[in-house]
């Protein structure tokens, strides 16, 4: 491998390795995290780490590295290696071009830029990593963008005393975010000619009854659940699809609902109650849910204080990330990294070189305080 000479060259290398999450329409044939995991493994070995590739799904591993310091508390740096689709991008998604003081390409902000800043700080600190107060771990987590298989797997395998998930937070420390549940709903009926609706069973009409209950009963409940940092729980109807022609009674209708819970509101019982209520409104409705827990780590945690000494302000975020799966298992976790979340998933994604270099300086100073 060609050794990068700067954090910018490191990020260019990472961007040029396609690692698009294969879920949905990736927009390219270069999917999966296998190639970038292999590259990271070699880079980390060069930094003196003990490295494992832990396969989570076929050909899609987590890359897990540590600088052994037995008996010390464990600190994990945890960026994700996958990106969202490159479909519709207005720039070369894998070009890694440096232009106008920015590095351009898919993942430059989310989250190969923060990953590069972490890695370069570890590289610059490599001679003393085993002498710090904590045993240092690094994990490139697969599949954060869909179902978070990588973080779920590692959180089940290992215990850490503190986790920093890499996200573009402007170098502020996200200690709290909402939980979520993405629901897919399907109602079924019987097709027929629209001139004889009495002979059919309209699946869209059934879905409208379901959505009316969601908007009245559940939306009102969510609006009353508030957090001083994160605001209110929210509920949004995201998509609805049904019917083939105006003169055909639709036999299928699908809708999706996005729920976001403040930490005190998130309970498995709410998801179960939602399912039961929809079944009452429309017997036989098909409901599937993809839940993610909220994140909350005490902002008075000593390592959050050390992050604060480096300039990070404690904040909440409306989105969710891999940190929540470690927190769910009792491990203090936060999200932090250079760059802006507003650049994540955009058609012309970039990160400013100045922000990238600030990220390296931030993580280097943080490591020096351990």
Language model: regions and residue ranges:
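Short, surface-exposed alpha-helical segments at coil->helix boundaries
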Residues: 8, 30, 34-38, 115, ...
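Hydrophobic/aromatic beta-strand patches that form the interior of the parallel beta-sheet core
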Residues: 75-77, 139, 162-164, 332-334
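Fold-level recognition of mixed alpha/beta catalytic cores in primary-metabolism enzymes, strongest
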Residues: 100-103, 109, 113-216, 345-358
């Amino acid at each position: 491998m060609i050794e990068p000479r700067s954090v910018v060259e490191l990020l260019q290398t990472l961007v040029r390795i396609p690692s698009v999450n294969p879920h949905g329409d990736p927009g390219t044939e270069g999917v999966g995290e296998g190639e970038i995991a292999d590259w990271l493994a070699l880079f980390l070995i060069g930094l003196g780490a003990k490295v494992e590739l832990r396969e989570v799904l076929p050909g899609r591993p987590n890359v897990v590295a540590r600088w052994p310091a037995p008996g010390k508390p464990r600190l994990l740096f945890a960026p994700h290696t996958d990106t969202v689709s490159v479909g519709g991008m207005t720039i070369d998604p894998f070009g890694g071009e440096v232009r106008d003081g920015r590095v351009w390409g898919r993942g430059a902000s989310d989250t190969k830029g923060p990953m590069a800043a972490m890695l370069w700080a570890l590289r610059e600190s490599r001679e003393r990593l085993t002498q710090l107060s904590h045993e240092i771990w690094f994990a490139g987590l697969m599949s954060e963008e869909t179902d978070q298989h990588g973080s779920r797997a590692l959180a089940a395998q290992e215990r850490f005393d503190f986790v920093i998930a890499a996200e573009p937070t402007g170098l502020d420390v996200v200690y709290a975010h909402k939980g979520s549940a993405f629901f897919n709903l399907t109602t079924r009926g019987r097709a027929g000619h629209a001139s004889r609706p009495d002979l059919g069973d309209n699946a869209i009409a059934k879905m409208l009854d379901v959505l009316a209950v969601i908007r009245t009963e559940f939306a009102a409940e969510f609006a009353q659940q508030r957090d001083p940092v994160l605001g209110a729980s929210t509920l949004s109807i995201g998509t609805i699809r049904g019917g083939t022609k105006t003169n055909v009674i639709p036999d299928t209708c699908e809708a999706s609902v996005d729920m976001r819970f403040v930490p005190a509101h998130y309970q498995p019982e709410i998801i179960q109650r939602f399912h039961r209520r929809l079944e009452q409104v429309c017997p036989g409705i098909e409901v599937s849910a993809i839940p993610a827990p909220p994140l909350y780590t005490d902002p008075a945690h000593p390592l959050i204080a050390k992050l604060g000494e480096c300039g990070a302000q404690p904040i909440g975020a409306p989105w969710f990330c891999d940190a929540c799966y470690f927190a769910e298992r009792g491990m203090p976790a936060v999200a932090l990294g250079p760059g802006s979340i507003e650049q994540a998933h955009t058609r012309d994604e970039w990160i400013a070189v100045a922000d990238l270099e600030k990220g390296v300086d931030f993580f280097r100073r943080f490591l020096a305080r351990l």
